[in-house]
Swiss-Prot record:
Limits of the GST N-terminal domain: 18-101
Annotated protein name in UniProt: Glutathione S-transferase verG
EC number(s) per entry: 2.5.1.18
Record keywords, A-Z: Transferase
Factors inducing expression: Expression is regulated by the cluster-specific regulator verZ.
Organism encoding this protein: Clonostachys rogersoniana
Length: 239
C-alpha cells in the first residue's frame, strides 16, 4: 500500500513504493539536489512540502535528528529506509536507480574524484553559503559584519577553486571531464544565478564557473526541477 504523505502515522511507519522527498518552500539549495537527479534519471518519486513546525514534530525528528530538509524515505528489499543528507541521497539514489551509471563513476578512480567534489560541497561550499545567509538575516545587535565579510571572502575563494578547476583543458564538468555527475548536481544550487546574485557575487569574475553553470542549467532534468520550484506548496499533514 502506498505511503500516505498527508498522514503523520503513515509517514512515520509505512513503506513507500517510490522515493519520497521532504522539501520546504523558500531556500531550496539542498533539497533540490536529489530531485534533480531523480528527474534526470526519469525515476518516479513523490515530494512532500512541509512547514517549519512540521520539522519539529516527533515523527519528523525520528526521520531527521537535525530537523532539516531534505529528508527521504524509500524502499529497499521491501524494507523502509531513510536518508537525511543531500549528498548521501545523491549517492544512494545513483547507486540504486542509475543502472547505466550515467551520473556516477565507471570505476574506482572516477568514483573517488566524484566523492572529492561531493565532499568539497558538503564540508566547504555548502556550510559557508549557509552561514553567510544566516549572518545576512541578522538584525540590530545580532548583526556581525566582520563574520559576514569572512563568509563572503571564503565563498569567493571556493568559487575561485571551482573556476580554476573548470578552466583546465577539457574539464567541462566538475566531477569528471566528459560528463556531469552527482558532484555537479551537489554544487550547482550554490552556484546558480539566484544564489550568487543574492550573495552579491558577479559570475563574470568566474568565467569558467559561469559557462559550466549555464551548461548544467540546460540539462533537461535540472531545468525541470528548477521550473517546478514555485509549484512546491506546503501540504497539511494530519494524524
Amino acid at each position: 500500500m502506498p505511503i500516505n504523505k498527508f498522514s503523520a502515522r503513515s509517514l512515520d511507519n509505512d513503506v513507500p513504493n517510490k522515493p519520497l522527498i521532504f522539501v520546504m518552500e523558500g531556500r531550496y539549495q539542498n533539497w533540490i539536489k536529489p530531485i534533480m537527479l531523480l528527474e534526470c534519471l526519469e525515476i518516479d518519486y513523490d515530494a512532500a512540502c512541509i512547514d517549519g513546525p512540521t520539522t519539529r514534530t516527533d515523527w519528523f525528528t525520528r526521520l531527521h535528528p537535525q530537523r532539516y530538509v531534505p529528508a527521504m524515505i524509500d524502499v529497499e528489499d521491501g524494507q523502509r529506509v531513510s536518508s537525511w543528507d543531500s549528498s548521501q541521497m545523491l549517492q544512494y539514489l545513483s547507486n540504486k536507480y542509475d543502472a547505466k551509471r550515467m551520473w556516477n563513476g565507471h570505476n574506482a578512480a572516477e568514483n573517488l574524484e566524484i566523492c572529492n567534489w561531493l565532499t568539497f560541497e558538503t564540508a566547504s561550499l555548502g556550510p559557508t553559503a549557509k552561514y553567510w545567509v544566516w549572518y545576512a538575516l541578522r538584525q540590530g545587535e545580532e548583526q556581525n559584519p566582520k563574520a559576514q565579510q569572512k563568509m563572503y571572502n571564503d565563498l569567493r575563494v571556493q568559487y575561485s577553486i571551482l573556476d580554476k578547476h573548470l578552466a583546465q583543458p577539457g574539464q567541462n564538468w566538475v566531477g569528471l571531464k566528459d560528463r556531469p555527475t552527482i558532484a555537479d548536481l551537489a554544487i550547482y544550487p550554490f552556484a546558480d544565478d539566484p544564489t550568487m546574485a543574492r550573495m552579491g557575487i558577479d559570475k563574470k569574475d568566474f568565467p569558467s564557473l559561469k559557462a559550466w553553470s549555464e551548461a548544467l542549467s540546460k540539462v533537461p532534468g535540472v531545468a525541470k526541477a528548477y521550473a517546478e520550484l514555485d509549484s512546491r506548496k506546503e501540504i497539511a499533514i494530519g494524524a
